């Protein structure tokens, strides 16, 4: 069974953390992953930096740009993660844009992910229809879960289609804006969370965008299986370096 599926079956709210691979320094990636697991994080999203990130807010864009400047590439990330399963047991997801995956070769990329123990992918600019028609069989061949994003603007019909081709969780974007642009949730988000809850989807949902502290984590997980923190963690890395992860996670849990 895929590690993501196993984790989702646990009777707890999932804390997922996103960071850009190769940030703050090129070789910080593995240490950050190990420290996040050690401090009780349930799931890690490793951002593969890309030069034209559509959905990312300024904080994640800046970290991605710095990581590219540091020399991060798809191959270097794979090399860094080659032995990650010797020390890390929790689910790992690579989040990135489709272009670098296409350049590497979709099947070669999926094969490499499976070899090193990556459990899933999040590719915001890969349309679900294209995935279902052209790539689903490849992902499944290598045991990878593909996670799709939904927003308040996504129709119920589209959400049900996404649910039907998904086999892990659905990434529930809390607003239609870019990451890191909110603090807290208002009535609009609460109505949206309730709407999704009432659809009774087969896949659990994890909320992302706008989660930055204990309050927003607890608010989001009232309606969902878990929540993802990205921009706030990257800000913490930029201000405190990779040595104070315990402090950050301790304030959420």
From Swiss-Prot:
Gene3D superfamilies: Aldolase class I
A Gene Ontology term for the protein's cellular component: cytosol
Molecular function terms, GO-annotated: tryptophan synthase activity
Origin: domain of life: Bacteria
Database matches in InterPro entries: Aldolase_TIM, RibuloseP-bd_barrel, Trp_synthase_alpha_AS, Trp_synthase_suA
EC number: 4.2.1.20
SUPFAM superfamilies given in the database record: Ribulose-phoshate binding barrel
Pathway assignment: Amino-acid biosynthesis; L-tryptophan biosynthesis; L-tryptophan from chorismate: step 5/5
Keywords: Amino-acid biosynthesis, Aromatic amino acid biosynthesis, Lyase, Tryptophan biosynthesis
Reaction equation(s) it catalyzes: (1S,2R)-1-C-(indol-3-yl)glycerol 3-phosphate + L-serine = D-glyceraldehyde 3-phosphate + L-tryptophan + H2O
Active-site positions on this chain: 45, 56
NCBIfam families linked: trpA
Family membership: Belongs to the TrpA family.
Oligomeric form and interacting partners: Tetramer of two alpha and two beta chains.
UniProt function note: The alpha subunit is responsible for the aldol cleavage of indoleglycerol phosphate to indole and glyceraldehyde 3-phosphate.
Protein name: Tryptophan synthase alpha chain
The organism of origin for this protein: Flavobacterium johnsoniae (strain ATCC 17061 / DSM 2064 / JCM 8514 / BCRC 14874 / CCUG 350202 / NBRC 14942 / NCIMB 11054 / UW101) (Cytophaga johnsonae)
Gene that produces this protein: trpA
């Amino acid at each position: 069974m895929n590690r993501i599926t196993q984790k989702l079956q646990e009777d707890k709210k999932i804390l997922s953390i996103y960071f850009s691979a190769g940030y703050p320094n090129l070789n910080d990636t593995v240490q950050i992953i190990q420290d996040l697991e050690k401090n009780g994080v349930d799931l890690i999203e490793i951002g593969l930096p890309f030069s034209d990130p559509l959905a990312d807010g300024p904080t994640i864009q800046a970290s991605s740009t710095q990581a590219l400047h540091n020399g991060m590439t798809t191959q270097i990330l794979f090399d860094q993660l080659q032995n990650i399963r010797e020390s890390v047991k929790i689910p790992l997801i690579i989040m990135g844009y489709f272009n670098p995956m296409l350049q590497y070769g979709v099947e070669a990329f999926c094969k490499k992910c499976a070899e090193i123990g990556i459990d899933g992918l999040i590719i915001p600019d890969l349309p679900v229809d294209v995935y279902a028609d052209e790539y689903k069989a490849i992902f499944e061949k290598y045991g990878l879960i593909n996670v799709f994003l939904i927003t308040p603007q996504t129709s119920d019909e589209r959400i049900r289609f996404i649910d039907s081709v998904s086999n892990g969780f659905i990434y529930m974007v809390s607003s239609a804006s870019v990451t890191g642009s909110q603090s807290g949730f208002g009535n609009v988000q609460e109505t949206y969370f309730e709407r999704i809850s009432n659809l009774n989807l087969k896949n659990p949902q994890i909320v992302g965008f706008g989660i930055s502290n204990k309050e927003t984590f607890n608010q989001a997980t009232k309606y969902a299986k878990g929540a993802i923190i990205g921009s706030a963690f990257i800000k913490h890395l930029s201000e405190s370096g990779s040595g104070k992860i315990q402090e950050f996670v301790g304030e959420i849990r």
